[in-house]
Structures are given as C-alpha cells and as structure tokens.
Amino acid sequence: IYACYQDREGGIWIGTYFSGVSYLSPKHKDIEWYYPNGTENSLSGNVISQFCEDPDGNIWIATEDGGLNLFDPRTKKFKNHLLRSSNPNIGYHNIHALLYNEGKLWIGSFSRGLYILDTQTGKMKNYRHNRANPHSIPNDHIYSIYQTKDGSIYLGTLSGFCRYDPESDSFRTLEPLSHIFIYDMVEDQHGDMW
C-alpha cells in the first residue's frame, strides 16, 4: 500500500505500488479494482501516490508513472491530465502530492516543482525553484502539500518545507528545516506542524 484515503461518503481508496487502485465501498462492502487497461477512460498509471476529493465528489488521483487522473464515481470513468512543461508537446507523469483548495488543485511533482490547476478554467501555473529568488519554492521535488486549520498551505520538499504567501504569490522557506527531506506533514491539536 502506497497511499490510502477515505472519501466523504466513507469509501476507502487504496493506492498501490504497481497494482493500481482498490476501492472499498461503504455501502456494498465489496472491492472495486482499477488499473490501466489501455482504454481512453481507464486509470493511466499503476503507481498511486496520493488521492484527494473535490466538492463534486470526484476523486483526483496522483500517479508516479501516469500523471494526474480525475475519477468520476458516477460514470466510473477516468480522465487523464498531463502536466505540461514549457514545451506543450511534453507531458509529465511523476506526481507525488495533491491538495484541493477553493477551486484549485495543488499538484506536487517530482523534479518539476508545484503546479496549481484552476479546475474551472483549466489554466495551470507552475512554480519552480530559483536560486536567485529566496521566495521561490526551496526545491523542485515536492512530496507533500498540507493545509492547516487556519488555511495556511505548506509544501514538503527534498530541501525542507515552506509556507505559501497568497498576498505576494510566493513562498517562505521555514528554518531550521531548510535542508531536510520532508515526506509528509500533519498539524496537531495545538496547531503545531510535525
């Protein structure tokens, strides 16, 4: 098991390393399996790294070998979203982290930085590490994205973690963890980050 997520209806989504997705329905108590089968509406990857849910009940699925997938539980169909680099002909497949917040999907990639997808317009913005800019993300390897109770958004990277500043549309790297690999984060009941 590589990732696990409980949706708002109580269903359990299990992401595996090379075996796709298993879903345990809370209503039927049966297991559904999803894996790439080469058709247009199937899952695009086998290495499942993260899940998140949007307000419409759709499940966003990050894979390390097939990019970003949107699963519609009503139709049981997948839609693949390739992240684009500066060259629109090159898609990127290795995604590690997801967060849905106010109509925007935050996407943490391996080696290509942070993408923010406006789910209404389809527009995407890419944030990359820039050595000349201390307010850029600290590293292009994003492993986790976390939103605290107060609405702050943090990124865990290969070189520490940072907090997003929405007013300046920039990031503040948090010391003394600026050179530590941050794989995951959680906020405790006191508002402290671990």
Residue ranges and their predicted role:
Residues 1-194:
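Carboxylate-rich, polar loop motifs that coordinate divalent cations or form catalytic acidic clusters
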